[in-house]
């Protein structure tokens, strides 16, 4: 028994596990389970945190080779950025999108890497198409917003933060850049700034350029409205309309604003254009303020004025006749053949005549066309009685008149013959055409044709002006920068404000950027004044700028101030214009016709990566070689002057001092009888400029 008990005890000990193994296994299992639960908990918390706190507000919706389009759901805005996101070309707020419900966007144009599509239900469809121009490292995007409701007002607003904007329409208060302007959103059409001072003036293009290297061009068929919120946003839009017309524009990005403008802002026609008649540049233009009610009195006034020019040794000039004086001579010449001999002395003068597409209903021309049954020469409306066309009456300079039917080839031929006939009879070469502004059918509810909507009349009238010869000047222009005609600048106030002298250089740069380098500036001292200009300092400072423009125009003769020194300064400015400036303009006119480069250039043209040049509005370049820095502040004989281009050297024409580019000259002395002019040294044009300088001495 004892031995069996001992054996059983021995067997029992052999079958039991090793001490602690079971406890250890259970501990590891519990630890692993706890760790898994903890990881799952942390992952859940992480996902929830990402969803609530860290989820990104932006996403790429379209990518090109050098740039792309980014959507920001928080601000409801799009940004065109470089792929590295170190540069923002443009930030656009889509104001028509709903304020709530912002989310990251998905591309509804499936599997299309060059197009982005998205729909905001009940609001608008968006389609953005990437387009890389041939032989270009830059990229363009065609943007199209289509409203889904006739109550939707489409509006894209481009931020002005860290971006200077240029282009668009001329303004009464002209700024360079346009960031400081403040204009309510309104139809983007040419208007008379005297009647509508907050509108857009005589030169206008649907083109905007940003200092970040971005160019925007709105498609022509868009019924565009443009507004500028000072230093905040430039807004392009379409008001609600029954047709639900889309907002279409193309935005292009490049490495600098100059390259963006050269690639996308310059429109070079297939056929190289002729230059305007540059003979008009050499002689100053004079406008007599004496009123005449008969042709003989007008002739007497002109001859008297011409004798005074010779008396003060101011040389020859072109006498600008207004429309009233032109019609006075035209009617007199028509009335009698004896006028061929009577006004022989008048024909010995150099005259510029002024005409318009308007004809008074009391005039012989209008009555004759009615008698001949040629009512179709004039714009008309269908008659309610029999459906035939009746001439459309409108006001022109206080009188009832009719307007040339520019869409009728017969009317165009008739007008051209009338102008050429008058030129032959008066023996004049230069014609100034006042076109009027706005659509002639505004306010005519029964007229549904859009042949002459917006600025179509102005555009077609400029095409007609080209047929009259390249000595023709038009009072307004759009989409015709390639034509060999001159464009007259808007009238300016006779003061030192941005509506007066301070707005002159911004206007020069604005016209040139849009392609209109051959312009006729307003008269020295401004034409929006009664009688002669009384401020002699304003007259001199204004004349110093005009010396470097295509034409010097006067309505206040220098002798009225009774100061010999003013006459002497005038004589000196005219001489400098004829011997130094005009040859320069001729040189750079060749670049305009072949490359589309502006003749008058902002400082950033030679230093596009220098932000100091983006906002300089009181200096300008002629070509790449001559920098003009006039005084535009009353009572000042010193001014700050910035010389662009770190690798350039600039020589003062007055003192022969040479300065390094990239330098700010503080309080640089500029006497009342002087204007600061600098010549770029060691450039390809330096020898030619030296020859011009030598010829002036």
From Swiss-Prot:
Positions in coiled-coil regions: none
Known partners and oligomeric status: Homodimer; disulfide-linked.
Main localization (coarse): membrane
Recorded topology in the membrane: Multi-pass membrane protein
Extra remark: Binds 4-acetamido-4'-isothiocyanostilbene-2,2'-dis ulphonic acid (SITS), an inhibitor of a variety of anion transport proteins.
UniProt keyword list: Disulfide bond, Glycoprotein, Membrane, Transmembrane, Transmembrane helix
GO molecular function (one): hydrolase activity, hydrolyzing O-glycosyl compounds
Any one of the GO CC terms: membrane
One GO term (biological process): carbohydrate metabolic process
Family: Belongs to the glycosyl hydrolase 31 family.
Role according to the record: This glycoprotein is probably not a functional part of the chloride channel.
Annotated glycan sites: 112, 134, 162, 386, 405, 470, 568
TM spans (from-to): 30-50, 503-521, 542-562
Domain of life: Eukaryota
Keyword presence, rRNA-binding: no
Region spans: Disordered: 1-20
InterPro entries on file: Alpha-glycosidase_related, Glyco_hydro_31_C, Glyco_hydro_31_TIM, Glyco_hydro_b, Glycoside_hydrolase_SF
Chain ranges on the Cytoplasmic side, renumbered to this chain: 2-29
Compartments it resides in: Membrane
SUPFAM superfamilies according to UniProt: (Trans)glycosidases, Glycosyl hydrolase domain
Protein name: SITS-binding protein
Matches recorded under Pfam families: Glyco_hydro_31_2nd (PF01055), Glyco_hydro_31_3rd (PF21365)
């Amino acid at each position: 028994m004892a031995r069996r008990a001992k054996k059983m005890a021995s067997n029992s000990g052999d079958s039991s596990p090793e001490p602690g193994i079971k406890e250890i296994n259970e501990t590891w299992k519990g630890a692993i389970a706890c760790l898994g639960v903890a990881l799952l908990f942390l992952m859940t918390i992480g996902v929830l945190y990402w969803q609530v706190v860290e989820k990104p507000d932006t996403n790429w919706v379209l990518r090109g080779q050098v740039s792309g389009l980014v959507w920001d759901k928080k601000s409801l805005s799009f940004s065109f950025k470089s792929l590295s996101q170190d540069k923002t070309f443009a930030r656009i707020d889509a104001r028509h999108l709903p304020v709530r419900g912002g989310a990251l966007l998905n591309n509804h144009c499936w599997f299309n890497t060059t197009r982005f599509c998205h729909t905001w239900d009940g609001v608008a469809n968006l389609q953005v198409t990437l387009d890389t121009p041939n032989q270009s490292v830059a990229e363009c995007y065609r943007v199209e917003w289509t409203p889904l409701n006739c109550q939707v007002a489409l509006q894209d607003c481009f931020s002005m933060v860290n971006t200077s904007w240029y282009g668009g329409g001329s303004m009464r208060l002209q700024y360079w850049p346009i960031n400081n302007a403040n204009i309510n959103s309104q139809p983007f059409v040419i208007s008379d700034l005297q009647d509508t001072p907050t509108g857009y003036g005589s030169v206008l293009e649907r083109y905007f350029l940003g200092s970040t290297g971005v160019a925007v061009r709105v498609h022509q068929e868009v019924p565009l409205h443009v507004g500028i919120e000072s230093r905040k946003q430039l807004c392009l839009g379409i008001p609600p309309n029954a047709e639900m017309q889309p907002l279409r524009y193309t935005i292009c990005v490049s490495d600098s604003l100059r390259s963006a403008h050269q690639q996308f802002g310059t429109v070079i026609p297939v056929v190289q254009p002729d230059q305007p008649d540059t003979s008009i540049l050499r002689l100053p233009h004079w406008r007599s303020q004496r009123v005449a009610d008969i042709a003989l009195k007008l002739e007497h006034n002109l001859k008297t004025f011409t004798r005074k020019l010779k008396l003060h040794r101011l040389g020859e000039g072109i006498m600008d006749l207004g429309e009233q004086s032109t019609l006075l001579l035209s009617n007199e010449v028509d009335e009698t053949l004896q006028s061929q001999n009577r006004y022989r002395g008048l024909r010995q003068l150099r005259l510029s005549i002024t005409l318009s597409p308007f004809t008074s209903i009391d005039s012989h021309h209008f009555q004759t066309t009615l008698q001949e049954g040629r009512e179709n020469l004039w714009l008309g409306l269908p008659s309610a009685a029999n459906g035939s066309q009746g001439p459309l009456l409108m006001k022109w300079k206080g009188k009832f008149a009719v307007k040339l039917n520019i869409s009728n080839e017969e009317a165009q031929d008739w007008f051209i013959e009338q102008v050429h006939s008058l030129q032959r009879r008066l023996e004049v070469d230069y014609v100034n055409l006042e076109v009027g502004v706005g659509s002639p059918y505004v306010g005519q509810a029964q007229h549904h044709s859009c042949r002459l909507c917006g600025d179509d009349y102005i555009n077609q009238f400029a095409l007609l002006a080209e047929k009259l010869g390249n000595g023709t000047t038009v009072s307004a222009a759009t989409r015709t920068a390639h034509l060999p005609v001159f464009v007259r600048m808007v009238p300016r106030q006779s003061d030192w404000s941005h509506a007066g002298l301070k707005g002159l250089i911004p206007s020069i740069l604005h016209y040139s950027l849009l392609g209109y380098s051959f312009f006729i500036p307003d008269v020295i001292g401004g034409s929006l004044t009664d009688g002669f200009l009384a401020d002699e300092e304003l007259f001199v400072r204004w004349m110093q700028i005009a010396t470097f423009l295509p034409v010097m125009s006067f309505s206040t003769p220098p002798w009225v101030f009774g100061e010999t020194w003013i006459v002497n300064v005038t004589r000196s400015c005219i001489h400098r214009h004829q011997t130094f400036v005009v040859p320069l303009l001729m040189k750079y006119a060749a670049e305009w016709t072949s490359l589309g480069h502006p003749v008058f250039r902002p400082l950033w043209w030679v230093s596009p990566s220098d932000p100091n040049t983006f906002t300089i509005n009181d200096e300008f370049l002629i070509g790449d070689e001559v920098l003009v820095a006039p005084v535009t502040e009353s009572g000042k004989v010193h001014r700050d002057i910035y010389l662009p281009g770190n690798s350039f050297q600039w020589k003062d024409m007055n003192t022969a001092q040479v300065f390094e580019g990239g330098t700010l000259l503080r309080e640089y002395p500029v006497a009342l009888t002087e204007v600061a002019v600098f010549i770029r040294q060691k450039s390809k044009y330096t020898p030619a400029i030296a020859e011009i300088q030598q010829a002036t001495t």
